[in-house]
Design a protein with these regions (language model features):
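Short, conserved loop/turn and helix-capping segments at secondary-structure boundaries
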Residues: 2, 53-57
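Short beta-strand segments
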Residues: 16-52, 71-73
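Short solvent-exposed loop/turn micro-motifs enriched in small/polar/acidic residues
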Residues: 13-15, 28-29, 85, 118-120
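Charged, gly/pro-rich active-site loop segments
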Residues: 2-3, 76-137
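Short coil-to-beta transition motif at edge beta-strands of beta-rich domains
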Residues: 14, 66-68
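Short, basic/aromatic recognition patches
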Residues: 1-19
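Short amphipathic alpha-helical segments and helix-helix/interface helices
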Residues: 9, 57-60
């Protein structure tokens, strides 16, 4: 597992949203925006109370069938000298209970004020990042 440079880590930790990419059964990518928390070499996201079109979410099925994922965090600015992105690629798993899930939810609650009122009740996806890639001008 690679470590993320301190400045890039700070940027990722402050970002409010990331994109989670998983692989559909037909091999095509599936990308969704997520709330997330970073801890050492893992990125966690949870299925929360925000309205969903179904309870059988594609991202969960994808991870269970093919346990790989990428998480992309980026920043856009009209001043292109301030653009940047960081991507973590790794293995992924769905966690439905136990201490690992509770710790992930605690990290999300600490980051997002909205979760203090309604902590995520659904499964957690844990991405163990094996490789970080980044770009900035």
């Amino acid at each position: 597992m690679e470590e993320l440079e301190p400045e890039l880590r700070r940027r990722v930790e402050r970002a409010p949203v990331a994109r989670l990419a998983t692989v559909r059964p037909d091999g095509h990518p599936h990308v969704v925006p997520i709330t997330f928390a970073l801890d050492a070499g893992t990125v966690v996201t949870a299925i929360d109370h925000k309205p969903k079109t179904t309870t059988s979410l594609q991202r969960l099925r994808n991870v269970e069938a093919r346990p790989v994922a990428s998480v992309l965090v980026d920043h856009y600015d009209e001043d292109w000298s301030r653009l940047w992105w960081v991507r973590g690629d790794g293995s992924a798993r769905v966690v439905t209970g136990g201490a690992e899930r509770e710790q992930a939810v605690e990290r999300l609650v600490a980051k997002y004020e909205q979760y203090r009122e309604a902590p995520p009740q659904g499964p957690v996806i844990v991405v163990s990042v094996a490789r970080w890639a980044a770009w900035s001008p």
